[in-house]
UniProtKB/Swiss-Prot annotation:
Subcellular location: Cell inner membrane
UniProt xrefs under PROSITE patterns: ABC_TM1 (PS50928)
Boundaries of every ABC transmembrane type-1 domain copy: 145-324
Protein's name according to its UniProt entry: Glycine betaine/proline betaine transport system permease protein ProW
Organism annotation: Escherichia coli (strain K12)
GO biological process: amino acid import across plasma membrane; carnitine transmembrane transport; cellular response to osmotic stress; choline transport; glycine betaine transport; glycine import across plasma membrane; hyperosmotic response
Region (Disordered), start-end ranges: 1-41
A Gene Ontology molecular function term of the record: carnitine transmembrane transporter activity
Family: Belongs to the binding-protein-dependent transport system permease family. CysTW subfamily.
Length: 354
């Protein structure tokens, strides 16, 4: 045992070995934190969040966003070639309209459109169309207006081809109408921007995807008003046609559709206006025309460029609205005159008609 009164006495070997191993005199007691884990790399225990009845929607309860994303990814992976095949007829018809409208010299196109307006709605509308189209060309928006007109006419054509037979079928099948009507409600209330993301993923960008998204956005009115027009045909006329032995085909084409034509044309008018309202939104996916002018003007803070595009859209909308309203007039309001006896066509055919 070492003498405690002798300052020169040596410490035990165990103590000297401990001091040589730890020059700073750190205590050598065993750690009590459960295995000596490094406090720099250790993560704290997660706090368990309990459901709070006063704030029930603090966390997402239904992961709708992930479901939709996974669903669209699955559709893109498995059905993208199918949707790329849908592009073919749309692209073909759109290119045909663009070549027709852009291939004609502007003066020839203005005269042709003015004559068509005269034939459909009278000489006053013909003059208004002439002046309006000259104004579009004068402000420097002629080519963009023709591109927009081609896009709108293509979308309108497909809406009529799809919507008119579908409306006739739903008018004859109340059970199917109950199933389709909520879908039409959802299509009409969904914001237009929502359609852009899946359309871009399935079809890409450009004019053809712009036409597709316009068709989807503008389709419900023509379906709804076709159903309404056929259902509003007086029941006594239907009974009279049946009593005279009319077949279902004859009843449809000679009784129901002619009487429902004003309402159907109101649906065409609404579809056309929705298609024009989609022009600026569709320009966000690289769709050309007047909407692209408006978008570029907004992006550059160029009020003049945006105004030119906006004025062009307004003029086109007014012309097309008046023309579709004129087509939708009841034939009885025009009397017994045939279409080929009025307007510029009547000037050519009148000498040959007794």
């Amino acid at each position: 045992m070492a003498d405690q009164n002798n300052p020169w006495d040596t410490t035990p070997a165990a103590d000297s070995a401990a001091q040589s191993a730890d020059a700073w005199g750190t205590p050598t007691t065993a750690p009590t934190d459960g295995g000596g884990a490094d406090w720099l790399t250790s993560t704290p225990a997660p706090n368990v969040e309990h459901f709070n009845i006063l704030d029930p929607f603090h966390k997402t309860l239904i992961p709708l966003d992930s479901w939709v994303t996974e669903g669209i990814d699955w559709v893109v992976t498995h059905f993208r070639p199918v949707f790329q095949g849908v592009r073919v007829p749309v692209d073909y018809i759109l290119n045909g309209f663009q070549q027709l409208l852009l291939g004609m010299p502007a003066p020839v196109a203005i005269i042709v459109f003015a004559l068509i307006a005269w034939q459909i709605s009278g000489v006053g509308m013909g003059v208004a169309t002439l002046v309006s189209l000259i104004a579009i060309g004068a402000i420097g928006a002629w080519s963009q207006a023709m591109v927009t007109l081609a896009l709108v006419l293509t979308a309108l054509l497909f809406c009529i081809v799809i919507g008119l037979p579908l409306g006739i079928w739903l008018a004859r099948s109340p059970r199917a109408a109950k199933i389709i009507r909520p879908l039409l409600d959802a299509m009409q209330t969904t914001p237009a921007f929502v359609y852009l993301v899946p359309i871009v993923m399935l079809f890409g960008i450009g004019n053809v995807p712009g036409v597709v998204v316009t068709i989807i956005f503008a389709l419900p009115p023509i379906i709804r008003l076709t159903i309404l027009g056929i259902n509003q045909v007086p029941a006594d006329l239907i009974e009279a046609s049946r009593s005279f032995g009319a077949s279902p085909r004859q009843m449809l084409f000679k009784v129901q559709l002619p009487l429902a034509m004003p309402t159907i044309m109101a649906g065409v008018n609404q579809t056309l206006m929705l298609a024009l309202s989609m022009v600026v939104i569709a320009s966000m996916i690289a769709v050309g025309g007047l909407g692209q002018m408006v978008l570029r003007g907004i992006g550059r803070l160029d009020m003049g460029l945006a105004t030119v595009g906006g004025v062009g859209i307004v003029i086109l909308a007014i012309i097309l609205d008046r023309l579709t309203q004129a087509v939708g007039r009841d034939s009885r309001s025009r009397g017994n005159r045939r279409w080929y006896t009025t307007g510029p066509v009547g000037l050519l055919t009148r000498p040959f008609i007794k």
